[in-house]
C-alpha cells in the first residue's frame, strides 16, 4: 500500500510476500530432480558410488543393468522427490496462513459480515502493541490478559473497540483501521487506566473515562502522523502516552471519583545487599518484562505473550526476549532495587525498542542487530531518567522512553549500506522486511554493472570529476580526508535534505576553503581595489617591500590562525594516529566554535590546570564520541572538523564535575564511555530534523545526554551519586555594599571557563588566548557575552557567589559568539543583536535553573541552545542582518569577507542589468 500512514506497523502488504516465500521452494535453485552428471555413461557405475561399495567387492567389476530398470528406478526417485517437494510447499502454505500478518485470512474476510471484520480489526489492534499484525496472536494475548486480570482485560478490550470505532467515525484510512493501527493505543489506555486506578477491580464508573480517553487516541494519532510524515516516522505509542499522562495528571492520587496510585520520587539511598539477589527471580523477570508492555507482572502471562509473538514472527520474539534481558542488566548496572527489577519495570521499554530497531524498521543485519542492543540499553537509562523526573509530579513514565529513544535511532543517518531503514510503506514484519531488503540490494547490484555501459559515455566536466572522486574515495582509508574539499558545517550533523542530497553529493558537508585567510593582504588589496603605480620610485619600492614582508607575515600567521587548513592538508598522507589526534583537538575547541588544533591544545592545557581528572574524563569523552562516529560511518569531513567530538568532551567533563564520588573514581569512566558514544547518534538525529530549517544542533546532544544521566542516577544512587541540587526556598541575603569589583572583573574569564565547567580564572584566561589565536572576533564576543551575563545577574539580585563563579556568564558567552559573526555576518546591527541574545540567554538561564532545580538537575547549556536557535529563526527585511547558509559558515573574519564578496557581485550584476536596460 502506498499511503503514508505512520504507525508502528504499516498495513501495506507486501503483495509478493507469499510469492517470495513460495519461490524459495520452487525456484530453479531448488531442482525437483537430480540431473545426471554423467550422461555419457548410462550403464556404468556413477563415480560417486565407487566410494560406497564394500571393500570385498572387486574394483575391476563393472556393474551392468538394463536400461529400462535404470529408467524405472530414476522415475521412482523423481516421483519421490516431487512428492517431498509438494509436501514441503503444502506445509509452507499451511504455516503461512497462521504466521506473519495472515494476509490470506484478511482477504477471505473482505466479503464476510462486518461484525467478523470488526473482530479481526480489534484482535489485530490488540497485537499491534508489540508490532504484530496477526489476529491469532491478538487472541492469544487476550488469553494472557485474562490470566493476569479479567477486569483489566475488559477495560483494555473496551479501549480497543472505542478507539477503532472512533477512527471509523472520523473517516480514517480503512486499511490502517483493518490492520489495527487505530486500536493498539486504545488497548494500552484501557489497561493502564485500570492498572493505576486506586479503586478495586470492577469499579464500573471507570469505564466512562476509559471511553473518553480512548476516543482521543485516533485524533492524536492523525495529528502526530501529519508531523512525523515529514521524516517518514511512525507515531508509536505517543498517543497513549499523551492521553494517559494527561488523565493521571488531571486526576491524581487525591481525586474523589478516580484516584490513582501514588507515585513519589526517591528520597534516600536504597538498601541493597547483593547476596540477597535471587537468580530464579531474575530469570523470571525476562518474561515478566515482556508482559509489562501490557502492564502485566504475571510470568505466565509474559510467557503467553512470547508464544503469541513467536507465532507471527520468531525474530520479534527473539528481540523481545533480548530487550528484556538488556533492561534487566542495565538496571543492575545502576544499583536498582531488586523488587523493581523482579517486576519487569526496567525491561518493557527495552523490549519495544529492541523489536523496533532489530528488524522491524531497519532491515535485519548483524549491524542493525547490534544497533538494536544499543538502542535497548539507551532506552533503559532514558526510562530511569524519565521515571525520576516524572515521579516529582506523581506521574508514571509510561512508554515515553521507548518512543523517544526509538525515534532518535530511526533519525540516524549513516553511509553504511548495511544499516538500511525501510520506507514506512514497506514495513510488515522482520522476515518479510529482510526479503524486501535483499530484493532491493540485489536489484541495485544488477543495475551497477549495466550503469557503466556505452549508452552514456562520460563527458568532461565538473560532475564527472566529482563522481570519479567519490568512486576513488571508497577505496581509501577510513582516516583519509580530502582537506581541499571539506566544507564547514557549523555543528550540523546528518544528511542535509536527506536522500536527495546524499545522491547528488556523497560528501555534503565538505569543508571548503574560505574566500580568504585571516589577515590575507592579497585579498584585502583586491577588495579595496588598490591600484599600484606603474612608475618605479623609491617610495613605491619601500611600499612594495613592506607589502611583501606583510604577505610573509600573513602567510606565517595563517598557519596557526583561522582553521589551520594547511595542517589538515599536511596530515592527509600521514599516519591515521596523527589524523585522529588532530580530529580530537579540533573537537575539543569546537565547543567554542573554533576549528583549530592549536586552540584545542591550549584548551586541554587549561583543563589540566583546572583539574587533571576532569581533563582525563573530557578527553576520553571526545575520543569515544569521535570513534563512534567513525564506526557509524558518519560524514568524514564532519568528523575531521571535530563536529562529532565537542559534545563528547562536554559529556565527560560535566559527568566528572557533577560526580559526588570525588576525583579519580575510575568506575565513572564506564558511564562516560557509554554516554559519550550516544552523542553522534543524537547529533545525526537532530541534524536530520534541523536541516529542514538549515539550523545547527549546537550542544543539544550534550544537554540531552547529561540531563538523562543525572536524572537516571541522582544524588541517592549507590554507584554513581551526583551533586545534590535543590530549589531556592528562602530569600537570599544580599548586601550591595559587600560587592567586590575585583571579583566581578575576575568573573569575566571565569564565565568563559565555565563553558567547560571550570571556575579557575587562569583556565578562563588560557581559553581566551586559545580563542584569540583562531579568531579575535570570537575572543571579543566571548568576553562581551560573559560581561552581559554578569550584568544581567546583577539586575535580578542574584547571589554574589553565583556571579563570582561565572555561573551566569557561560550561556551568554556561547550565545554572543554564535550570533556575533559566526552564523550572522558581523555588522553593527548583528553586533547589537548578539548583545541582545546574550541578555536573553542570561535571563533564560535563570528561569531554567529554577525550573530544573525542582528535579535536581542543572541547566547545562539549554539556555544557550534555545536562545541562539530562537534568534537564528528570526526573519527580517534588513539586509544588514544576513544569516549565512550553514555550508558557508567558517569563522567570523572569513564569514565577513564572504558576505562582502557576495554583496560586490550582487551590485555588479545590478549595474550590468541597468546598463543593458539603458542601452536598449
Curated annotation (Swiss-Prot):
The keyword Glycoprotein applies. The modification Phosphoserine is found at residue 477. Keywords: Cell membrane, Glycoprotein, Membrane, Phosphoprotein, Transmembrane, Transmembrane helix, Transport. Gene3D superfamilies: Ammonium transporter AmtB like domains. The chain crosses the membrane at residues 151-170, 176-196, 204-224, 233-253, 272-291, 302-322, 346-366, 370-390, 392-412, 600-620, 638-658, 666-686, 695-715, 764-784, 803-823, 832-852, 854-874. Residues 47-57 have a biased composition (Basic and acidic residues). Belongs to the urea transporter family. This is Urea transporter 2. It comes from Homo sapiens (Human). The lineage of its organism: Eukaryota, Metazoa, Chordata, Craniata, Vertebrata.
Amino acid at each position: 500500500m502506498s499511503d503514508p500512514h505512520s504507525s508502528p506497523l504499516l498495513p501495506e502488504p507486501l503483495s509478493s510476500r507469499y510469492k517470495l516465500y513460495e519461490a524459495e521452494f520452487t525456484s530453479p535453485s531448488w531442482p525437483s530432480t537430480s540431473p545426471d552428471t554423467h550422461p555419457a555413461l548410462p550403464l556404468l557405475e556413477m563415480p560417486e558410488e565407487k566410494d560406497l561399495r564394500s571393500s570385498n567387492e572387486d574394483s575391476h567389476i563393472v556393474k551392468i543393468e538394463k536400461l529400462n530398470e535404470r529408467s524405472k528406478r530414476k522415475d521412482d526417485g523423481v516421483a519421490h522427490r516431487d512428492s517431498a517437494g509438494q509436501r514441503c510447499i503444502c506445509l509452507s502454505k499451511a504455516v503461512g496462513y497462521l504466521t506473519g500478518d495472515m494476509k490470506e485470512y484478511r482477504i477471505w474476510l473482505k466479503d464476510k459480515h462486518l461484525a467478523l471484520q470488526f473482530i479481526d480489526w480489534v484482535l489485530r489492534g490488540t497485537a499491534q502493541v508489540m508490532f504484530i499484525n496477526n489476529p491469532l496472536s491478538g487472541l492469544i494475548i487476550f488469553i494472557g490478559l485474562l490470566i493476569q486480570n479479567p477486569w483489566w482485560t475488559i477495560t483494555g478490550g473496551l479501549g480497543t473497540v472505542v478507539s477503532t470505532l472512533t477512527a471509523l467515525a472520523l473517516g480514517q484510512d480503512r486499511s490502517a483501521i483493518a490492520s489495527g493501527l487505530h486500536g493498539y493505543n486504545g488497548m494500552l489506555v484501557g489497561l493502564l487506566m485500570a492498572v493505576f486506578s486506586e479503586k478495586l477491580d470492577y469499579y464500573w464508573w471507570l469505564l466512562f473515562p476509559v471511553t473518553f480517553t480512548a476516543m482521543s487516541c485516533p485524533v492524536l494519532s492523525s495529528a502526530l502522523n501529519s508531523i512525523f510524515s515529514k521524516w517518514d516516522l511512525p507515531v508509536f505509542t505517543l498517543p497513549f502516552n499523551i492521553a494517559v499522562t494527561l488523565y493521571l495528571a488531571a486526576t491524581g492520587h487525591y481525586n474523589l471519583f478516580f484516584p490513582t496510585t501514588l507515585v513519589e520520587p526517591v528520597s534516600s539511598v536504597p538498601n541493597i545487599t547483593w547476596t540477597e539477589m535471587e537468580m530464579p527471580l531474575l530469570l523470571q523477570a525476562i518474561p515478566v518484562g515482556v508482559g509489562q508492555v501490557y502492564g502485566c507482572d504475571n510470568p505466565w502471562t509474559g510467557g503467553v505473550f512470547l508464544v503469541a509473538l513467536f507465532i507471527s514472527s520468531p525474530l520479534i520474539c527473539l528481540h523481545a526476549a533480548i530487550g528484556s534481558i538488556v533492561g534487566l542488566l542495565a538496571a543492575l548496572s545502576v544499583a536498582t532495587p531488586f523488587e523493581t527489577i523482579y517486576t519487569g519495570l526496567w525491561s518493557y521499554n527495552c523490549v519495544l525498542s529492541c523489536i523496533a530497531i532489530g528488524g522491524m524498521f531497519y532491515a535485519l543485519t548483524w549491524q542493525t542487530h547490534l544497533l538494536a542492543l544499543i538502542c535497548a540499553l539507551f532506552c533503559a537509562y532514558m526510562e530511569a531518567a524519565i521515571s525520576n523526573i516524572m515521579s516529582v509530579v506523581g506521574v508514571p513514565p509510561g512508554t515515553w522512553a521507548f518512543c523517544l529513544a526509538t525515534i532518535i535511532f530511526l533519525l540516524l543517518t549513516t553511509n553504511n549500506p548495511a544499516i538500511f531503514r525501510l520506507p514506512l510503506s514497506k514495513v510488515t514484519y522482520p522476515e518479510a522486511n529482510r526479503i524486501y531488503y535483499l530484493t532491493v540490494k540485489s536489484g541495485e547490484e544488477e543495475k551497477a554493472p549495466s550503469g557503466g555501459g556505452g549508452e552514456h559515455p562520460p563527458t568532461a566536466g565538473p560532475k564527472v570529476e566529482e563522481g570519479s572522486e567519490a568512486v576513488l574515495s571508497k577505496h581509501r582509508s577510513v582516516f583519509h580526508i580530502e582537506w581541499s574539499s571539506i566544507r564547514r558545517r557549523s555543528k550540523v550533523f546528518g544528511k542535509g535534505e536527506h536522500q536527495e542530497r546524499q545522491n547528488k553529493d556523497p560528501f555534503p558537508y565538505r569543508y571548503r576553503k574560505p574566500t580568504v585567510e585571516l589577515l590575507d593582504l592579497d585579498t584585502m588589496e583586491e577588495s579595496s581595489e588598490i591600484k599600484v603605480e606603474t612608475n618605479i620610485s623609491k617610495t613605491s619600492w619601500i611600499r612594495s617591500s613592506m607589502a611583501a614582508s606583510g604577505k610573509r607575515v600573513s602567510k606565517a600567521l595563517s598557519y596557526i590562525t583561522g582553521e589551520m587548513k594547511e595542517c589538515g592538508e599536511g596530515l592527509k598522507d600521514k599516519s591515521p594516529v596523527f589524523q585522529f589526534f588532530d580530529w580530537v583537538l579540533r573537537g575539543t575547541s569546537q565547543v567554542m566554535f573554533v576549528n583549530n588544533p592549536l586552540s584545542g591544545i591550549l584548551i586541554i592545557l587549561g583543563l589540566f590546570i583546572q583539574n587533571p581528572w576532569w581533563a582525563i574524563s573530557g578527553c576520553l569523552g571526545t575520543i569515544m564520541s569521535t570513534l563512534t562516529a567513525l564506526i557509524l560511518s558518519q560524514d568524514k569531513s564532519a568528523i575531521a572538523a571535530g563536529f562529532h567530538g565537542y559534545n563528547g568532551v562536554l559529556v565527560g567533563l560535566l559527568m566528572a564535575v557533577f560526580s559526588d564520588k570525588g576525583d579519580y573514581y575510575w568506575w565513572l569512566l564506564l558511564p562516560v564511555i557509554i554516554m559519550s558514544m550516544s552523542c553522534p547518534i543524537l547529533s545525526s538525529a537532530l541534524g536530520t530534523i534541523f536541516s529542514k530549517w538549515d539550523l545547527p544542533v549546537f550542544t543539544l546532544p550534550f544537554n540531552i545526554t547529561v540531563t538523562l544521566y543525572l536524572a537516571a542516577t541522582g544524588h541517592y544512587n549507590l554507584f554513581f551519586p551526583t551533586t545534590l541540587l535543590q530549589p531556592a526556598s528562602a530569600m537570599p541575603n544580599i548586601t550591595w555594599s559587600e560587592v567586590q569589583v575585583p571579583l566581578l572583573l575576575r568573573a569575566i574569564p571565569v564565565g568563559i571557563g565555565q563553558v567547560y565547567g571550570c571556575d579557575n580564572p587562569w583556565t578562563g584566561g588560557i581559553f581566551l588566548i586559545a580563542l584569540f589565536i583562531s579568531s579575535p572576533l570570537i575572543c571579543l564576543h566571548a568576553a562581551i557575552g560573559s560581561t552581559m551575563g554578569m550584568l544581567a545577574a546583577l539586575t535580578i539580585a542574584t547571589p554574589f557567589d553565583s556571579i563570582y563563579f561565572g555561573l551566569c556568564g557561560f550561556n551568554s558567552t556561547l550565545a554572543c559568539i554564535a550570533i556575533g559573526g559566526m552564523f550572522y555576518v558581523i555588522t553593527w546591527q548583528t553586533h547589537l543583536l548578539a548583545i541582545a541574545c546574550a541578555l536573553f540567554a542570561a535571563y533564560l538561564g535563570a528561569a531554567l535553573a529554577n525550573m530544573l532545580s525542582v528535579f535536581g538537575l542543572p541547566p547545562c547549556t539549554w539556555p544557550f541552545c534555545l536562545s541562539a536557535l530562537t534568534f537564528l529563526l528570526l526573519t527580517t527585511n534588513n539586509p544588514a542582518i544576513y544569516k549565512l547558509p550553514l555550508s558557508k559558515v567558517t569563522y567570523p573574519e572569513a564569514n565577513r569577507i564572504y558576505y562582502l564578496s557576495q554583496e560586490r557581485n550582487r551590485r555588479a550584476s545590478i549595474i550590468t542589468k541597468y546598463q543593458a536596460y539603458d542601452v536598449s
